[in-house]
Amino acid sequence: MRWNNHSGLEGTHAFLSASSYHWLNYTDEKLISVFKNKLAAQRGTELHDFASRCIKLKQRLPRSNKALNAFVNDAIGFNMDSEVLLYYSDICYGTADGIYFGKQRGSDRMILRIHDLKTGEIPAKMDQLMIYTALFCLEYGMKPGEMDIELRIYQGMDILFYNPKPEEILPIMDTIIRFDKIIKEVKTVEGVN
């Protein structure tokens, strides 16, 4: 048999793929809903890329009540870096949308700022940003009590602010260390790299 050539699609997955067979049971409405969610996720990725480019180029956006504009402008105003990978191990790491660590304006006290842009509809929680804070502390040998911490989530037309206490970050750091060790032990027993 001479197979048709589809080399341009290698490594990709069709929306209606055989390996994601659940669509066989979708109603038309469910199909449309799932596809729109996929489009929204793609748009979210594109918006994150756009925001990151604006921040890196120090290109402010027009003032508005949109989270994207506020996120970009605040990141530039606070001299933040965009898309910074925070690493504890190959098992635990993550990328912060916007991050800054340095002296606070008008103070000798250090501050860690982590901002996150959420483009979806599901209300966001601070847990992800608290994990980034723990990863920062672990990677750079910092103690949460040695600095001020400000976390922000930009979503829709809202900005959520949170200043976690060291007692909230320390257990996350401990969990990362413990779970990382457990996974490494399991990988050793299972002969997995």
Where are the language model's segments positioned?
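RNase H-like, two-metal
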Residues: 154-158, 177-180
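Accessory terminal regions of nucleic-acid processing enzymes
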Residues: 181-193
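Catalytic cores of nuclease domains that cleave nucleic-acid phosphodiester backbones
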Residues: 33-113, 120-127, 139-149, 159-164, ...
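Surface-exposed alpha-helical segments enriched in charged/polar residues
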Residues: 73, 134, 174-177, 181-184
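Short, well-ordered amphipathic alpha-helices
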Residues: 130-138
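Charged, glycine-rich intrinsically disordered N-terminal tails and low-complexity linkers that flank
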Residues: 1-50, 193
